[in-house]
């Protein structure tokens, strides 16, 4: 069953996000630190009539990395060509993309950490000096061909910056850490989405929905659609705080934005491992989830909310988690 609080895209959400996508930095809600930096760097590059330094955007899924890439291209007034790490399977794929770039273009590579190393190495000279050397032919007839590239800006997006090689990471002149959204910013996003799709929502209801959306716009917009359905069938169409609470409760989204999987993780740690410490691999096996899924999808929010701590000996449940789930807490010595 698809998880309502999944950070990744579900179904037709890609087309929905394109509809909601802001065009310029002034329209982009949240991520103020990244925006303020980019505003200066972009304006400086435009005044010098140069391409913008290469940009690395990293952070959990659903926080607007792809949207930010399109906004950067719009601010620069250039075209954006989009691909992803898994889609670039061999060197020839990347060469074809690079050879198709116009001066100043933005090349956006999502999930850049998933590029094969043989492909990644071609990027080094392309990013640093705007050229590539490729081998044509095989055996004794092979020869090296030098291709000059127009100045361009590479924007890489990743949820796992630690998996990037040092040589690739070092070639990004600008890095932007996309963080979980503050509730106030997320409330504004919910109200903007409701306005675009002609929904009627009370400000307090938008705040309640935002508060339980894990600091993630993608999740907030998904929940808004489900709450709208609930309001239409169980009410008069108006999205109120009461309707929002009832709808989210029906969807198993609790007051802290946790769903049944989050609670399963915490309950397992408390009931089976006495609150920890427990290793990530052991925990993953016990709850029947992939290790990477637990580490990338569930754990970051639980840590951010103060329900789990990482220690040298494993993961530990905090007193806050005990209290939230109604377990008695005894401090360990």
UniProtKB/Swiss-Prot annotation:
GO molecular function list: ATP binding; ATP hydrolysis activity; four-way junction DNA binding; four-way junction helicase activity
Descriptive protein name: Holliday junction branch migration complex subunit RuvB
Residues that, per the record, bind DNA: 291, 310, 312, 315
Known role: The RuvA-RuvB-RuvC complex processes Holliday junction (HJ) DNA during genetic recombination and DNA repair, while the RuvA-RuvB complex plays an important role in the rescue of blocked DNA replication forks via replication fork reversal (RFR). RuvA specifically binds to HJ cruciform DNA, conferring on it an open structure. The RuvB hexamer acts as an ATP-dependent pump, pulling dsDNA into and through the RuvAB complex. RuvB forms 2 homohexamers on either side of HJ DNA bound by 1 or 2 RuvA tetramers; 4 subunits per hexamer contact DNA at a time.
Domain of life the protein comes from: Bacteria
Chain segments carrying region Small ATPAse domain (RuvB-S): 182-252
The keyword DNA damage is assigned to this record: yes
Family the UniProt entry places it in: Belongs to the RuvB family.
Protein residues bound to ATP: 20-21, 62, 65-67, 128-130, 171, 181, 218
Region (Head domain (RuvB-H)) residue spans: 255-333
Taxonomic source organism: Streptococcus equi subsp. zooepidemicus (strain MGCS10565)
Cellular location(s): Cytoplasm
Subunit and partners: Homohexamer. Forms an RuvA(8)-RuvB(12)-Holliday junction (HJ) complex. HJ DNA is sandwiched between 2 RuvA tetramers; dsDNA enters through RuvA and exits via RuvB. An RuvB hexamer assembles on each DNA strand where it exits the tetramer. Each RuvB hexamer is contacted by two RuvA subunits (via domain III) on 2 adjacent RuvB subunits; this complex drives branch migration. In the full resolvosome a probable DNA-RuvA(4)-RuvB(12)-RuvC(2) complex forms which resolves the HJ.
Residues that hold Mg(2+) according to the record: 66
């Amino acid at each position: 069953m698809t998880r309502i609080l999944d950070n990744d895209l579900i179904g037709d959400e890609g087309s929905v996000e394109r509809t909601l996508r802001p065009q310029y930095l002034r329209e982009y809600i949240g991520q103020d630190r990244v925006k303020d930096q980019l505003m200066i760097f972009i304006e400086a590059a435009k005044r010098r009539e140069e391409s913008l330094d290469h940009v690395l955007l990293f952070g959990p899924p659903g926080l607007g990395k792809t949207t930010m890439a399109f906004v950067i291209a719009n601010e620069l007034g250039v075209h954006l060509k989009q691909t992803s790490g898994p889609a670039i399977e061999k060197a020839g794929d990347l060469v074809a993309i690079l050879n198709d770039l116009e001066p100043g273009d933005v090349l956006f590579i999502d999930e850049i950490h998933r590029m094969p190393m043989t492909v990644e190495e071609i990027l080094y000279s392309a990013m640093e000096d705007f050229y590539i050397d490729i081998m044509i032919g095989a055996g004794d007839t092979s020869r090296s061909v030098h291709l000059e590239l127009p100045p361009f800006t590479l924007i890489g997006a990743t949820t796992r910056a630690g998996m990037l090689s040092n040589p690739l990471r070092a070639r990004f002149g600008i890095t932007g850490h996309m963080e979980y959204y503050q509730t106030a910013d997320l409330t504004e996003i919910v109200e903007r989405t409701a306005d675009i799709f002609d929904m009627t929502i009370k400000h307090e209801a938008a705040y309640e929905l935002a508060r339980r959306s894990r600091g993630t716009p993608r999740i907030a917009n998904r929940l808004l659609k489900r709450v709208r359905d609930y309001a239409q069938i169980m009410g008069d169409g108006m999205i109120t705080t009461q309707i929002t609470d009832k709808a989210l409760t029906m969807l198993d989204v609790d007051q802290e934005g946790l769903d049944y999987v989050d609670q399963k993780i915490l309950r397992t740690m408390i009931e089976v491992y006495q609150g920890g410490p427990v290793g990530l691999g052991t925990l993953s096996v016990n709850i029947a989830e992939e290790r990477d899924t637990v580490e990338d999808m569930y754990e970051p929010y639980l840590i951010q909310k103060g329900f789990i701590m990482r220690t040298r000996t494993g993961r530990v449940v905090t007193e806050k988690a005990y209290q939230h789930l109604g377990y008695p807490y005894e401090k360990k010595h």
